[in-house]
């Protein structure tokens, strides 16, 4: 098992290093918040997001046209560490982006998208007060359906502003299916480094029908994610 972990981690690491040579601009995402950036036709990216408790979410995305991209991801928990790795789901999650308006000098770019990949562990149910509560959700919900508007300016290097709304699709068993709001920006420092900042308001995660912390999980706190 340790050899398997070593092989997977090294594959992800070296692939990420290789892909950074031709990273598209503007970025497809900030840290987790989507932008209106899409992949050029015929190009692809492979990236991984490291999550808490040794989890990794590798994602492959392909640009089918300049305005349409499709990706798949697969959450693996406890890949880093001594615990036995396990997957969130037996099937991969999907990411779809379609840019309906290209950015111009005066107007921002607008993208409609779908992202079913949440953050953290996916749980079908939890135990609360000796009762089984069905939740069917990630620790941090997936974006689901979303719309994002992006505008870039050349201000001593690129400055990008990104604002969007989203609605979860399949993670509403907690009784909270509100629309959500997010925003972020990226500031190019030089050709190799950029400053990224994002905020997810988590309006769709500020209520839970059992109304407690549930095994120290963060469900229902509604404080947002910075």
Please give the residue ranges for each predicted region.
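Outer-membrane pore/translocation modules
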Residues: 22-24, 74-177
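Outer membrane beta-barrel transmembrane domains
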Residues: 184-188, 192-226
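Outer-membrane beta-barrel biogenesis signature
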Residues: 18-47
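Residues that define the transmembrane beta-barrel architecture of outer-membrane proteins
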Residues: 40, 52-58, 87-94, 139-145, ...
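Outer-membrane beta-barrel architecture
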Residues: 39-45, 57, 69, 105-111, ...
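Residues on the lipid-exposed face of transmembrane beta-strands in outer-membrane beta-barrel proteins
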Residues: 46, 58-62, 72, 94-98, ...
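Outer-membrane beta-barrel strand-turn architecture
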Residues: 40, 52, 64-68, 76, ...
């Amino acid at each position: 098992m340790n050899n398997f972990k070593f092989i997977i981690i090294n594959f992800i690491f070296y692939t990420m290093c290789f892909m950074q040579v031709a990273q598209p601009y503007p970025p497809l995402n900030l840290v987790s918040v989507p932008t209106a950036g899409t992949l050029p036709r015929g190009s692809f990216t492979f990236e991984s997001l490291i999550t808490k408790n040794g989890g990794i979410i590798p994602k492959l995305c392909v640009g089918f046209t300049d305005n349409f991209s499709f990706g798949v991801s697969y959450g693996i928990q406890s890949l880093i560490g001594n615990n036995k790795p396990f997957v969130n789901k037996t099937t991969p999650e999907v990411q779809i982006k379609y840019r309906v308006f290209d950015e111009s000098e005066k107007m921002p770019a607008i993208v409609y998208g779908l992202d079913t990949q949440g953050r953290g562990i996916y749980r079908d149910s939890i135990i609360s007060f000796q009762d089984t509560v069905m939740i069917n959700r990630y620790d941090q919900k997936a974006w689901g359906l979303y719309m994002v508007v992006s505008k870039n300016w050349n201000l001593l290097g690129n400055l990008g502003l990104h604002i969007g709304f989203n609605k979860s699709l399949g993670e509403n068993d907690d009784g909270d299916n509100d629309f959500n709001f997010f925003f972020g920006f990226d500031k190019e420092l030089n050709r190799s480094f950029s400053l990224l900042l994002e905020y997810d308001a988590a309006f769709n995660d500020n209520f839970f029908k059992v109304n407690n912390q549930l095994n120290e999980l963060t469900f229902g706190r509604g404080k947002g994610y910075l």
